[in-house]
């Protein structure tokens, strides 16, 4: 007989800095209310995201009936990748009036290829349009 499927009791979505998960808020309270071993998650997450230190990495945690969990890390948010590529701290307060930086077509393609698994796009060109739209809404102009 195949093993029984575990019953899912919760799905938690968080955005945590890579390699810097600790039991303090927002991680502790979010996991604590589902009865998950917080330190176990923190150690596993930090080990899984060690290579991406400094970036914010979204994570989707599935909690099961027996209080065990699995998690899937996603790619960093497009806005964070755009800020990093443009070399700026934050986007424009008035995106359609004040432009704060420029991105080349190659930079947009690079971000689109990185985000491809998490985007609802069929090809890289469609993904590039999504990334370019995000950049424009942040006051970053896209060349090409």
From Swiss-Prot:
Pfam families: Ribosomal_L11, Ribosomal_L11_N. Belongs to the universal ribosomal protein uL11 family. Signal peptide: none annotated. Keywords: Methylation, Ribonucleoprotein, Ribosomal protein, RNA-binding, rRNA-binding. Forms part of the ribosomal stalk which helps the ribosome interact with GTP-bound translation factors. PANTHER family: 60S RIBOSOMAL PROTEIN L12 (PTHR11661), LARGE RIBOSOMAL SUBUNIT PROTEIN UL11M (PTHR11661:SF1). Gene3D superfamilies: Ribosomal protein L11, C-terminal domain, Ribosomal protein L11/L12, N-terminal domain. This is Large ribosomal subunit protein uL11. InterPro entries: Ribosomal_uL11, Ribosomal_uL11_bac-typ, Ribosomal_uL11_C, Ribosomal_uL11_C_sf, Ribosomal_uL11_CS, Ribosomal_uL11_N, Ribosomal_uL11_N_sf. GO terms for molecular function: large ribosomal subunit rRNA binding; structural constituent of ribosome. Part of the ribosomal stalk of the 50S ribosomal subunit. Interacts with L10 and the large rRNA to form the base of the stalk. L10 forms an elongated spine to which L12 dimers bind in a sequential fashion forming a multimeric L10(L12)X complex. It comes from Streptomyces lavendulae. It comes from the Bacteria.
